[in-house]
Amino acid sequence: AYRYFNNPKYLTAAQKTADYLEREIISKADYFSSTLDANCEDKEASLYAATAMYYLALISTGEEQQRYADLCLKASYFALSWYYLWDVPFAQGQMIGDNGLQTRGWGNVSVENNHIDVFIFEFGSVLNWLSKRYNEPRFHDFVQVISSSMRQLLPFENHMCGVAKTGYYP
């Protein structure tokens, strides 16, 4: 909003929010209850924190930029801990298993709801930026895993994912 409207009060509000996120969430690794459907730790809270710090780093310079980048990095590591690095062996007869779904690269939602989803939004861009900034190719590599994993449920002829119609994403 600061850049879009060229209004410094939006930057000040974002900086105060970042201070709060650092003090109450990131420094404590207390990514808790940031969704409407969970009252427990969840990856979404860390995604929000990482993304907020990413955008602040993009509009900052010098030590301030480094601070936001480091906070983004810390929140991103937590977020990544929720992403599957293996394929869950589904029991025979489960639709997603029968359709060959591979869970590697999918994010678990929360300990309360314990299901996978494709909730990522701009986190891929955040990870690619961190990869370049910190010379850490694993971030970029994992973005590729996440991206390819999400595309496996895109329906096409002879691969309708069990419930889909052409062009419909289940």
Predicted features along the sequence, with ranges:
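Glycan-recognition and catalytic cores of secretory/periplasmic carbohydrate-active enzymes
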Residues: 1-170
